[in-house]
């Protein structure tokens, strides 16, 4: 068991352009951290820096309070699971799982014990003599995980391990990963572009954008209190509604085009007259009526999802999505009267994009 610390680490490809801006992260012993963000945000590069596969330009990486910044990957006490299973096709499941231990010179008896225990944990007991071609995608990924488990690492590193699986199998493997972490309690750093994976697997999420950690927090914190416009737009499906407008002179209402004024929860007089962005999750918008002071929205389209529905409409040039109960099925062109609860509104600075 070990903690992991990244202390102001940076990465530059040409010595000038930083692809990882100074980033600090403290992962507690046994904690499961998920790095999530769009392609090119730097999450896989950062993971490879922790693994020792990419050189750290500046800063330090420590595992179990030991500085490993210049240490060879094999000496860091890490095990990595990749998107591609990278199994040897001519070897059995048992041989694939044992191979890394053999080349390290571990004794046969100890190897056999470790492989047997990993196979038991991953329910691969009956598959040990099979070759990779005889396995399903999920079974191959289990073998790849088993190969990492037998090493008994201080830290697990996962680089989008579920990306090659179909949707149904990804759900199953997410559950298995959760159960595996509860059993092993090994410090883990996991990379994905899939926010569902991030929200369901993580104890804490690090949302990355352009080489910067936009926000680090629990899945609930990141969802309920996004620190920036980027986090608000990236986390959530569908994404948070983001509406541009201005805070009125009294700081009590948010004014949109078309004379719509939404009451704000608390005083925002210091932002009076400033261009801001207001956010609200689709599920936090309630149906109301004209008599109750509801705000009108002309509906463009309706997505029927089964458990619920998504109504898409516009206020002028600004789009709005409302999550409705499954029995609510308004037709295109109809007017919905909406209530936007003050305590569910998020306000972001129009210039910096940061939460206020």
Curated annotation (Swiss-Prot):
InterPro entries for this protein: AAA+_ATPase, ABC_transporter-like_ATP-bd, ABC_transporter-like_CS, ABC_transpr_MalK-like, ABC_transpr_MalK/UgpC-like, Mo/tungstate-bd_C_term_dom, NA-bd_OB-fold, OB_MalK-like
Localization annotation: Cell inner membrane
Primary localization class, coarse: membrane
UniProt domain ABC transporter: residue ranges: 4-235
Enzyme class (EC, first level): translocase
Cellular component GO terms held in the UniProt record: ATP-binding cassette (ABC) transporter complex, substrate-binding subunit-containing
Domain of life: Bacteria
Function: Part of the ABC transporter complex UgpBAEC involved in sn-glycerol-3-phosphate (G3P) import. Responsible for energy coupling to the transport system.
PANTHER family attached to this UniProt entry: MALTODEXTRIN IMPORT ATP-BINDING PROTEIN MSMX, SN-GLYCEROL-3-PHOSPHATE IMPORT ATP-BINDING PROTEIN UGPC
Name of this protein: sn-glycerol-3-phosphate import ATP-binding protein UgpC
Source organism of the structure: Escherichia coli O157:H7
């Amino acid at each position: 068991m070990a903690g992991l610390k990244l202390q102001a680490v940076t990465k530059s490809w040409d010595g000038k352009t930083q692809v990882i801006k100074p980033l600090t992260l403290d992962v507690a012993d046994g904690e499961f951290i998920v790095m999530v963000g769009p392609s090119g945000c730097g999450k896989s590069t950062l993971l490879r820096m922790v693994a020792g596969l990419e050189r750290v330009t500046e800063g330090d990486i420590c595992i179990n309070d030991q500085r490993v910044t210049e240490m060879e990957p094999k000496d860091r006490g890490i095990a990595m699971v990749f998107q591609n299973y990278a199994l040897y096709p001519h070897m059995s499941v048992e041989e694939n799982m044992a191979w890394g231990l053999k080349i390290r010179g571990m004794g046969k008896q100890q190897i056999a014990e470790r492989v047997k225990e990993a196979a038991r944990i991953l329910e691969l007991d009956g598959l040990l003599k099979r070759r990779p071609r005889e396995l399903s995608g999920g079974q191959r990924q289990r073998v790849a995980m088993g190969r990492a488990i037998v090493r008994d690492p201080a830290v697990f590193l996962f680089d989008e391990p579920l990306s090659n699986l179909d949707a149904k199998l990804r759900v199953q493997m997410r559950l298995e990963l959760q159960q595996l972490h509860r059993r092993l309690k090994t410090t883990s750093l996991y990379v994905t572009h899939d926010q569902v994976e991030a929200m369901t697997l993580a104890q804490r999420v690090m949302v990355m954008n352009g080489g910067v950690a936009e926000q680090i927090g629990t899945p609930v914190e990141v969802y309920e209190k996004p620190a920036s416009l980027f986090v608000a737009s990236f986390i959530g499906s569908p994404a948070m509604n983001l509406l541009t407008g201005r805070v009125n002179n009294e700081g009590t209402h948010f004014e949109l085009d078309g004379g719509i004024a939404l009451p704000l929860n608390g005083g925002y007089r210091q932002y009076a007259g400033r261009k801001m962005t207001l956010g609200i999750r689709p599920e936090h918008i309630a149906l109301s009526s004209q008599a109750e002071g509801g705000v009108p929205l002309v509906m463009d389209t309706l997505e029927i999802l089964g458990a619920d529905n998504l109504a898409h409409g516009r206020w002028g040039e600004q789009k709005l999505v409302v999550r409705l109960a499954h029995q609510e099925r308004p037709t295109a062109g109809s007017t919905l009267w909406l209530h936007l609860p003050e305590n569910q509104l998020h306000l972001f600075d129009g210039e910096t994009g940061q939460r206020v």
